Structures are given as C-alpha cells and as structure tokens.
Amino acid sequence: MKTIGGKVFRHAAILAACVLPLWCQPALAERIKDLASIQGVRSNQLIGYGIVVGLDNTGDQTTQTPFTTQAMSNMLSQLGVNLTQEQSQKLQLKNVAAAMVTANLPSFSRPGQPIDVTVSSMGNAKSLRGGTLLMTQLKGADGQVYAIAQGNVLVGGVGASSGGSKVTVNHLSAGRIPGGATVERAVPTAVGQGGVVYYELANSDFGTVQKVVDAINRTAGAGTAQAVDGRRMVVKVPEDADSRVSFLGRIENLDVQPVAGVAKVVINPRTGSVVMNQKVTLDACAVAHGSLSVVVDAGQPQFGQAADIQVKQDNGSLMNVKAGANLADVVKALNALGANPLDLLAILQAMKAAGALRADLEVI
C-alpha cells in the first residue's frame, strides 16, 4: 500500500528552539556593503550557442535535433570542411550535443579576465559528462560579443544504465567550466561622476535608510549623505579617482544596525516549504482541517482487473490555536494542529484571510 502525504510539521519546533536564543539578543550590526549597493555597479548576463563534443555516445539524437547537425555543418565549413546538404542531413553524431552557454560578466571586468560559464544541453543529450565545449561567443543584450568560452565541462552528476534499468545521481545535462571564458570587451561603468554616488538598499526601508545616512554623516561629516526615498540615498564623493575609491571603501565597511523588517511568511506550494521570520505573531483562532489521503493498491497488476484506489478523509475536529507573541509560540501553536506541510499551507492562507496571522503571506 502506498500513501501520498507529507511529513508532520514538527521539525519546525526543533529549529525554532535552536535559533530562538539568537533572536532574543539585540540585532547584530551589518556593514553597509551588505545592506546596499552603488547604483550602476552590477553584473551583466551573457549568453551564447555552443557545441559540446567528445561525449561517450551520450550526445543528441541528431534525427530529432536538426539544429545540432546544422551547427556542426556550419562549423565544419568555417574550418574548411565542406559538406553537401544531403551529407549534412545524414550526419549521425552521437558524441556531439548542442548547448546554451551562460555567464555573468562582473562589474569592472577588463579584457583578458577569466569568468565562469554554465553549459546546459538544449537537445536530448543523455549526459554532458566528459565533453568539451568548442569556442563559443558570449553576447550581451545589445548583441555585442563580450567574452569567448571554451573548455572541458565539469558535471557533478553520474549515471549508468543497463538492461532497461537506469540510475542517475544529480543532474547530467548541465555543467560548469570554471574560468572557461575570457572577457574580450569591457562594459563602461561610471561611478562618482558629478561628485556623487547613489546607494540603493536591497530591501526598501525608510528606517534603515536613515540609519545608513546617519552612520555616513558621523564618519565623513554632516551633509555628506542624504536620503532620497525609502531605498536610495545620495553620497558626496571626492572628484579624484584614487580618493574616491578609498572613501567608498571606508563607507562600505561602516556598521549599521538595520531596522527589523516586516513580519512575513513565505510558502512554496510545490515543495511544501514554509519559512517565517521572527516578527510573525498569531491572534487566537479556531481551526478545523480534515486530512485527505489517497491510497493505491501496490499489488501485481492483472489483465482485466481494475486498480484498487481509495480516497480517505479524516474528520477534522475544531482546535483552538493560542495567540503567539514570538516565533517559538507560533511554531508551537501550528505544530499542535498536527498538519503536514501541504495542509499547513492552506491553514496559513485561511488564517491570513481571517485576520489571525499577523504577517505578510508570500507565495513563491
């Protein structure tokens, strides 16, 4: 007999008991570089279409992936090997796979600097393990080539198959090449032009913005920093490039104690995950939730015999959920319901609708 259901949500109580002493202490200070970033200083995404060769009969089935044979034919013609259209269509390349190559171009990257790339199969290749990515142009959103990638693909997974059975550990159709691309073109990044830079918080909060401004003004002098809104602040910087870099380095390492964020519960219906911060509280309420399970007979199938499938629904009794003033109380109250994570998602949404859950509910 197989029963479809989740594990009971009692692990959360253990987690809360372990981390609660940390939350009872005052909030720790964080560096400005951990809270905010300079506007315009960011990475840029690159993408390219490449070919992985050297696979051990685990490449694309070229009869089902015509773009692989077309790419190989184009590459061979550039190398002086010309094939007729009929020859190109008859290519059977079990050791070749078409792949998309992606990378992030860090800010201030200069030509000649190596960057990591990710190689992902886009056809029906079984594995990229042991393959080599041939020279691939990586382009930005503007269509310009910013890096060239090539190298051996490192795949963290492993797999084997025999006699119709197959075992796979981790993912085999994607891998990485550490330092596999070389930057060919730099992206201009203007910092401090006009004598000011703009800092942007990762999360909007008026209180934290004001604390960052106060910390900068205490160190660099009154009027150096000024809040713009709940996310941005403007900071006056030296005109000289060397002095500007030194000044920003000191500013980024200043300690600031951020204001506690809003109470929030994040749930993922696909995995049954529930995460909440320490500001979540509960008002007293009553909850009744029936448990639904599906039972499938796992016996040997016989021709002409219908499968034995049963749907069972337990009677949910009305339970009193006590008010909780801190995370430990909230977890204890929810754990008392005895609901599995999937049921808990529906309970939390109903609590929010009833006004008993004092937190923002976010579904990802």
UniProtKB/Swiss-Prot annotation:
Pfam families: FlgI
GO molecular function, one term: structural molecule activity
Entry's localization field: Periplasm; Bacterial flagellum basal body
Signal sequence extent: 1-29
Record's keyword terms, sorted: Bacterial flagellum, Periplasm, Signal
Record-level GO BP terms: bacterial-type flagellum-dependent cell motility
Cellular-component GO terms for this entry: bacterial-type flagellum basal body, distal rod, P ring; outer membrane-bounded periplasmic space
InterPro entries given in the database record: Flag_FlgI (IPR001782)
Quaternary structure annotation from Swiss-Prot or TrEMBL: The basal body constitutes a major portion of the flagellar organelle and consists of four rings (L,P,S, and M) mounted on a central rod.
Function: Assembles around the rod to form the L-ring and probably protects the motor/basal body from shearing forces during rotation.
Record family assignment: Belongs to the FlgI family.
Protein name as annotated: Flagellar P-ring protein
